[in-house]
């Protein structure tokens, strides 16, 4: 914008057809401010269903990432205008913008100043809240935070706040004995071996090593390259990462709500106030509400006993429990059901039917 070149730049964003998941109003503010050529891609449940099989075929492995299909849809539109996209992935890890990073600091204060009896009362009140399918709803945040705070290890709490399935749910879903070592134990061991004295640096590294590298980069590369578009990650520039590593963790995350503090202060002169002052929000689908709406036909077809048990891996009774809890709004199992659905589709495309090539994008 400062060089007068922004009017030749194309920007792309996804608009979710659910207000609590939709960032479109802020995206319009930013694109208008930058004077870019903006493309807003509206994504409905029907759009996701139409692109789901192709996305699974290109990802090549089961995934529970709720942004994979929207990214695939965005890239299909971007293909009409550009060959390379710049992605903001990595900024949350480098500058501590995740809600779980703020929760890490809040947990320490919470356990320090609230005795066990008070925490038990707060947890009971949190679990009395009605289930909502809105993004980061009050009941979801309160329940997950209260439960994670009772775990003794920092890494165990961090992974608990990130989980899709609990250890008990994972074991019940399998038709054979689960691995001897729980997932959280693996992350605790990795956390304990990290050469950093500060816990915030350690959980940042956990996210970088296992979430960013094994999920976000894979999702971006495969879903976007499906349309022959390269994705670049400016936040992963060697100089940026090395600089961020020199910033004390208490400055990167200022107080409990100051994620990306240094980055935001540096960019303040170049950002509209409404963008500067808002909190972080990740791209995700409202699958929790869509499962009995726009996903209903897909759900009815692939959650039968025959489909669920076809792989010889999933236990139908456990899946049925997830469905019942979600439908009765006892729990928000939307992310868990999305993972199960993706596994079933992947198994059909790559193993049972073996017809994944029929869904690959042809230039």
Give the location of each predicted region:
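Flexible loop/turn segments at secondary-structure boundaries
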Residues: 18-22, 47-49, 93-95, 233, ...
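Short secondary-structure boundary/capping segments
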Residues: 29, 55-56, 99-106, 357-358
């Amino acid at each position: 914008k400062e060089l007068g070149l922004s009017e030749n730049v194309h920007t792309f964003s996804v608009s979710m057809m659910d207000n609590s998941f939709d960032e479109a109003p802020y995206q319009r503010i930013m694109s208008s401010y930058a004077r870019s050529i903006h493309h807003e891609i509206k994504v409905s449940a029907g759009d996701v269903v139409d692109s789901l099989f192709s996305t699974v075929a290109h990802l090549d492995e089961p995934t529970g990432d709720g942004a994979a299909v929207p990214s695939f849809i965005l890239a299909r539109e971007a293909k009409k205008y550009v060959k390379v996209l710049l992605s903001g992935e990595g900024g949350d890890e480098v500058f501590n913008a995740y809600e779980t990073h703020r929760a890490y600091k809040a947990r320490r204060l919470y356990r320090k100043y609230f005795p066990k009896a008070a925490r038990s009362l707060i947890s009971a009140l949190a679990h009395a809240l009605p289930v909502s399918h809105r993004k980061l709803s009050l009941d979801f945040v309160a329940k997950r935070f209260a439960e994670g705070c009772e775990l003794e290890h920092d890494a165990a709490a961090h992974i608990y706040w990130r989980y899709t399935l609990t250890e008990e749910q994972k074991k019940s879903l399998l038709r054979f004995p689960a691995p001897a070592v729980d997932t959280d134990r693996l992350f605790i061991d990795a956390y304990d071996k990290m050469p950093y004295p500060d816990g915030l640096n350690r959980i940042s590294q956990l996210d970088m090593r296992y979430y960013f590298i094994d999920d976000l980069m894979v999702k971006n590369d495969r879903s976007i390259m499906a349309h022959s578009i390269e994705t670049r990650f400016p936040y992963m520039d060697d100089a940026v990462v090395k600089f961020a590593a020199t910033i004390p963790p208490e400055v990167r995350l200022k107080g409990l709500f100051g994620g990306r503090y240094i980055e935001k202060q540096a960019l303040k002169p170049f950002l509209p106030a409404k963008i500067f002052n808002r909190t972080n929000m990740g791209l995700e689908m409202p699958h929790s509400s869509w499962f009995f709406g726009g996903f209903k036909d897909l759900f009815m077809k692939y959650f039968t006993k025959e489909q669920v048990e076809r792989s010889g891996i999933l236990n139908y009774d456990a899946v049925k429990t997830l469905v019942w809890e979600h439908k009765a709004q006892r729990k928000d199992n939307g992310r868990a059901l999305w993972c199960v659905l993706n596994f079933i589709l992947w198994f059909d495309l790559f193993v049972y039917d073996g017809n994944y090539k029929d869904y690959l994008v042809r230039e």
